[in-house]
Amino acid sequence: MNQFLRFLPVFFALTLGACASNEPAATATTAPPGFVVGSITHETSNGSYRLGIAGKPGQRIREPSVGGGLLPFSNQTDDDLKEKGGTFELELPPGEYRIVRWSIRRGSTDTQSAQPFEISFTVESGKISYLGNLHFDPHWENVSLRDRASRDMPILLKRTPKLATLEVAYTIRKDANLERLGNGYKSRSDIPFIMPLPAR
């Protein structure tokens, strides 16, 4: 009997340990994303016009875009914006982000801002961050980020009704006009080099 009592605490310890190990592990909850919105407009021929958004170091750059038509002179005028281009909406996890570049894709040619730049903004869970209007001048020499909230937001709410119930957490400064983003541009072509065959 005394020998049984001596091992009883060990038995209870093992039993409690087994019960604890059978409990389901707590699952981490992820905060709902925020909504990043804005518009991209241009005064040139067709292509895919993009805005580069960076998060934490090591994360891939996200690029909301408008356009992309293959025919260079097809109509890309947005009837609501009354300009060539369009609006964009992007879901991102809550956190701190930066606008770091702009770029254009036309056929096999990629063009992007000549120098990096940074415009910081915040994304909050379940809220809207309005980045403004990225506008490309005819020669891409004075690409600007402008406040067009009074025009853009009603259009965005009409196109994405779920945004109408959300609070705006961030917006570009009222009447802002940030000019010459990236100080010009640089281009790169992906046309493959074909080695000519020697004449026979």
Please state what every model-predicted region is.
Residues M1-C19:
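Sec-dependent bacterial lipoprotein signal peptides
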Residues C19-F73, I104-R200:
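Primarily secretory-pathway and cell-envelope proteins
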Residues G68-K84:
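Short, acidic Ser/Thr/Gly-rich low-complexity loop/linker segments typical of extracellular
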Residues P93-R101:
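A short tyrosine-centered beta-strand micro-motif
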